[in-house]
């Protein structure tokens, strides 16, 4: 299976040095196509994707921001894709927030995320202390091992696809007074051609 590496070019070359080494280890022996620019994010439907984002000292990568904007602008850009994420930071901040916004954007663009989809490398790699101890290696070695394990799982992942999935909506609200039910009333008609929907009200302890 071919893997698509989406690896936004860093603002400064030094910001990508560590992540480059991690990727060489994680992707060794694999067939990989690499995309570095937002304008290259075309014809990606039903692909297996690995996002690898190098953040600078301030948690910013301008090419990544351009990619993020495109993902938010084109809701079917990654239709049918499966993805994992590696976010590498120069400091102790911003990796988690960057990963959160990226996960939301790729999911909204039609992409399913792997279970435990994130490998996060903070500046000190202190978040790998436990893994390093368990593996009998240093922090950098644990980081590389986590990235490799993510790619292994990503390549082996298959999401079951059903022609008409069942969707059950449980609620304990009144159709007349609930904002949540009003929202569901707007969402449900948009799903009925793709899902078999059933709604059950749980009120006053009854089913």
Feature annotation, model-predicted:
Residues 204-207:
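Cysteine-cluster motifs in flexible loop/terminal segments that predominantly coordinate metals
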Residues 1-198:
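FMN-binding flavodoxin-like domain, especially the glycine-rich phosphate-binding loop
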Residues 201:
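Conserved acidic residues
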